[in-house]
């Protein structure tokens, strides 16, 4: 059974709903995005996570920004920018958070950099942002899952990018992903999660067979 992260939540009721439906992680975006939350909003959202684990998503944060987010009590920091292995290690020791690094995948070569991040705790394999995009993630674009054929993950990992309730079972079967992450695929209006889609995604992922 694959684990599920619902990313880009902004509304406490939706956070509670996703957690009740069985989301393992709920993600909050602290970067420019239609899904961005403030520190004050995140403090309120954290009250609704139930049994789900909250993940703070940041893009090239400064020390002060990362420390302010970590101080809210997030156990996991997902880095979605151009953070180097050294910066990821630095942010880990600075915040005390587990670090997940997002890796943009377009070709098999992109997987090579993963070995240069020995200090991180997890990986999120996501599609690269479309040409000209100024936002680092949440574009609803998938990469070619066959790139992962024969790849052995050195860390716990999640598959992301363009997943939907309709394709998540196929994605898990094709890649063997132990976890999946979704943002746009559970929205009907950009930036607003939809209960029916959140429920359908979690059910489809949890019911799926890993190869
Ligand atoms: O979701 C955002 O708005 C976002 C903004 C800036 C950096 C990262 C962002 N999201 C990162 C995620 O973990 C998304 O869930 C991931 O990119 C997959 O998104 P989608 O293809 O929309 O499901």
From Swiss-Prot:
Catalytic function, reaction form: N-(5-phospho-beta-D-ribosyl)anthranilate = 1-(2-carboxyphenylamino)-1-deoxy-D-ribulose 5-phosphate
Statement: the UniProt record of this protein carries the keyword Manganese: no
Metabolic or biological pathway, per its Swiss-Prot or TrEMBL entry: Amino-acid biosynthesis; L-tryptophan biosynthesis; L-tryptophan from chorismate: step 3/5
Keyword terms, alphabetized: Amino-acid biosynthesis, Aromatic amino acid biosynthesis, Isomerase, Tryptophan biosynthesis
Enzyme Commission (EC) number: 5.3.1.24
Molecular functions (GO terms): phosphoribosylanthranilate isomerase activity
UniProt enzyme class: isomerase
Statement: the UniProt record of this protein carries the keyword NAD: no
BP GO annotations: L-tryptophan biosynthetic process
InterPro entries listed in its UniProt record: Aldolase_TIM, PRAI_dom, RibuloseP-bd_barrel, TrpF_fam
CDD domains: PRAI
Pfam families reported in the protein's UniProt record: PRAI (PF00697)
Stated family: Belongs to the TrpF family.
PANTHER family to which the protein is assigned, alphabetical: N-(5'-PHOSPHORIBOSYL)ANTHRANILATE ISOMERASE (PTHR42894:SF1)
Protein name, entry field: N-(5'-phosphoribosyl)anthranilate isomerase
Source organism of the structure: Hyphomonas neptunium (strain ATCC 15444)
Lineage: Bacteria, Pseudomonadati, Pseudomonadota, Alphaproteobacteria, Hyphomonadales
């Amino acid at each position: 059974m694959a684990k599920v992260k619902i990313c880009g939540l902004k509304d406490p009721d939706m956070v509670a709903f996703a957690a009740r439906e069985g989301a393992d992680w709920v993600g909050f975006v602290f970067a420019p995005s239609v899904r961005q939350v403030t520190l004050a909003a995140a403090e309120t959202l954290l009250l609704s996570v139930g049994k789900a684990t909250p993940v703070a998503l940041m893009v090239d944060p400064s020390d002060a920004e990362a420390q302010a987010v970590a101080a809210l009590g997030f156990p996991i920091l997902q880095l979605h920018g151009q953070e180097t292995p050294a910066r990821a290690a630095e942010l880990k020791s600075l915040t005390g958070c587990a670090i997940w690094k997002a890796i943009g995948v377009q070709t098999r070569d992109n997987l090579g950099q993963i070995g240069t991040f020995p200090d991180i705790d997890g990986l999120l394999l996501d599609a690269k942002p479309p040409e000209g995009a100024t936002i680092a993630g949440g574009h609803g674009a998938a990469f070619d899952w066959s790139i992962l054929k024969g790849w052995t993950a050195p860390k716990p990992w999640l598959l992301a990018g363009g997943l939907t309730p309709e394709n998540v079972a196929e994605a898990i079967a094709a890649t063997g992903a132990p976890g999946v992450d979704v943002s746009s695929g559970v929205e009907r209006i950009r930036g607003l999660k939809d209960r029916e889609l959140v429920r359908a995604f979690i059910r489809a992922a949890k019911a799926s067979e890993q190869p």
